[in-house]
């Protein structure tokens, strides 16, 4: 056996023995771990649940107030004006605010079924990563 090969194997053996004596063991996440962490995690989970319930209760309190203010603002807004007041621009604005599904469905308004839906090479293709 070559002296360099023997030396490298001996060093690897010594490294392996050293690591095995140190207690290099894996600690799986789902396996039995330190029990001292469990109460801390349980307390953190309880605090998170309390905070979520507080936020939900606050949202329920604020929601009716916002709806009431929305009614008052509707009377003062220009959207409450008659349709003739805004003229032809109103229909254009409504179309722009409408769903974008038809507008962004393909490349320059045409749907590229073969390229766009199968390979992801067409225009405006949503990636599913």
Curated annotation (Swiss-Prot):
Q: Where is this site: Cleavage?
A: 97-101
As recorded in UniProt, coiled-coil segments are: none
GO BP of this protein: blood vessel diameter maintenance; cGMP biosynthetic process; cGMP-mediated signaling; negative regulation of systemic arterial blood pressure; neuropeptide signaling pathway; protein folding; receptor guanylyl cyclase signaling pathway
* Record-level Gene Ontology MF annotations: hormone activity; hormone receptor binding
Kindly list the GO CC terms recorded for this protein: cytoplasm; extracellular space; protein-containing complex
Enumerate the UniProt keywords alphabetically. Disulfide bond, Hormone, Secreted, Signal, Vasoactive
**Which residues are connected by disulfide bridges in this protein?**
107-123
Q: How is it modified after translation?
A: The precursor molecule is proteolytically cleaved, possibly by FURIN or CORIN, to produce the active peptide. May undergo further proteolytic cleavage by various proteases such as DPP4, MME and possibly FAP, to give rise to a variety of shorter peptides. May be cleaved at Pro-99 by the prolyl endopeptidase FAP (seprase) activity (in vitro). May be degraded by IDE. During IDE degradation, the resulting products initially increase the activation of NPR1 and can also stimulate NPR2 to produce cGMP before the fragments are completely degraded and inactivated by IDE (in vitro).
Signal peptide (from-to): 1-26
Alphabetical list of PANTHER family matching this protein = ATRIAL NATRIURETIC FACTOR PRECURSOR, NATRIURETIC PEPTIDES B
User: Function, please?
Assistant: Cardiac hormone that plays a key role in mediating cardio-renal homeostasis. May also function as a paracrine antifibrotic factor in the heart. Acts by specifically binding and stimulating NPR1 to produce cGMP, which in turn activates effector proteins that drive various biological responses. Involved in regulating the extracellular fluid volume and maintaining the fluid-electrolyte balance through natriuresis, diuresis, vasorelaxation, and inhibition of renin and aldosterone secretion. Binds the clearance receptor NPR3.
Q: Name the chain's protein.
A: Natriuretic peptides B
The top of its lineage is: Eukaryota, Metazoa, Chordata, Craniata, Vertebrata
Q: Which gene encodes it?
A: NPPB
């Amino acid at each position: 056996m070559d002296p360099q090969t023997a030396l490298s194997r001996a060093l690897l053996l010594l490294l392996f023995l050293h690591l095995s004596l140190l207690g290099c063991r894996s600690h799986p996440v789902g396996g039995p771990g330190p029990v001292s962490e469990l109460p801390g995690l349980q307390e953190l989970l309880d605090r998170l649940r309390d905070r979520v319930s507080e936020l939900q209760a606050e949202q329920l309190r604020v929601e009716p107030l916002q709806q009431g203010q929305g009614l008052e603002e509707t009377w003062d807004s220009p959207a409450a004006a008659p349709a003739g007041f805004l003229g032809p621009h109103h229909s254009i604005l409504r179309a722009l605010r409408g769903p974008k599904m038809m507008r962004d469905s393909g490349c320059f308004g045409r749907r590229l079924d073969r390229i766009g839906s199968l390979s992801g090479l067409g225009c405006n293709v949503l990636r599913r990563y």
